[in-house]
Swiss-Prot record:
Keywords: Amino-acid biosynthesis, Arginine biosynthesis, ATP-binding, Cytoplasm, Ligase, Nucleotide-binding. L-aspartate binds at T124, N128, D129. Belongs to the argininosuccinate synthase family. Type 1 subfamily. Homotetramer. This is Argininosuccinate synthase. The lineage of its organism: Bacteria, Pseudomonadati, Campylobacterota, Epsilonproteobacteria, Campylobacterales. GO terms for cellular component: cytoplasm. The keyword ATP-binding applies. The keyword Transcription regulation does not apply. GO terms for molecular function: argininosuccinate synthase activity; ATP binding. L-citrulline binds at Y92, S97, N128, R132, S182, S191, E267, Y279. Its EC number is 6.3.4.5. InterPro entries: Arginosuc_syn_C, Arginosuc_syn_N, Arginosuc_synth, Arginosuc_synth_CS, Arginosuc_synth_type_1_subfam, AS_cat/multimer_dom_body, Rossmann-like_a/b/a_fold.
Amino acid sequence: MQKKDVKKVVLAYSGGLDTSIILKWLQDEYKCEVVTFTADIGQGEEVEPARKKAISLGIKPENIFIEDLREEFVKDFVFPMFRANAIYEGEYLLGTSIARPLIAKRLVEIAAATKADCVSHGATGKGNDQVRFEIGAYALNPNIKVIAPWREWDLNSREKLLAYAEKNGIDISKKKGKSPYSMDANLLHISYEGLVLEDPNHAPEEDMWRWSVSPKNAPDESDIIEIEYKNGDPVAINAKSMKPHEILTELNRLGAKHGIGRLDIVENRYVGMKSRGCYETPGGTIMLKAHRAIESITMDREAAHLKDELMPKYASLVYNGYWFSPERKMLQAAIDESQKNVNGTVRVELYKGNVMVIGRDSKTDNLFNEAYCTFEEDSVYDQKDANGFIKLNALRFIIAGKNGRKF
């Protein structure tokens, strides 16, 4: 792609340091018109200042797109992923990963609407996000072109970025000196990387955590809540129906209050290196525990076991950027089929970093039958039936043993 061939670019724009510099750099290096796209996916910051910043950098008002995508994010991306109980490498709830396909989708759609040649993003050449953004974009438009400034320019340090900003009159509130953590926030989580976290043996500082109280300082009194599920999705809290993004917002509030959802892990990036990250996912941690609880009484055993076998593959696809892939959609179809009878309520107690399931019920799809599993006398289960069941399942061992084979 020749720079002279680029006439218009849609930039994923936050209004922060990196993307403001990218905006100016695109104007200078590519001599092109820039369209900015700012998504509100619940990052907890005002997005309107991005409009003022973009205008100050010469962007036409009609080329500024600021959209509230919180409901679409939770309804069409977070909830489908939580139906799968997706966890990457046993711990990570995929808060950053699941936000990228939605942003890629809107970048491509805005590019089509504005007749732009390219899309651009602020992901570095070391991380997973460049892969997620670009694979998503190519899946939705195979003819799209992508400009990834971090893979082109030489502004490869925070000090160089600040110097570039000062040289070009870009108003950046953060000053030289101690850099902030590299953070990503949305309605599902906040992630932290960099600084002391680059040493995996160095404990994170308490003042790093922005969202949740320390479990040590959480209230001495617990909260007990009831979450209602329909077809595998939460639809109400304490009998109050809510929209998807409202449910996650309320669970975040409750989880953060009780110090729930903090995580410190070393993960394997798709690009090949190991990375240490800290995460806060208060509402997601509650949702995962509650969802597994309602599945435990409504799902058939073999269907549940098969779903658990599929989950790591599903989680890897999301983590690596393959949300729009045919294989993820195939898995999603199977997962969604499994959720048709996942209906009912779960009661959880929230206390000092813990989510404890204390009750689960389903009026319509409960497979738990007390008459069969009671320790008291019953009239529906003949315990003698177990004789044949055990002998048939032991038959291969009996035959092999009689043939002299040792186990």
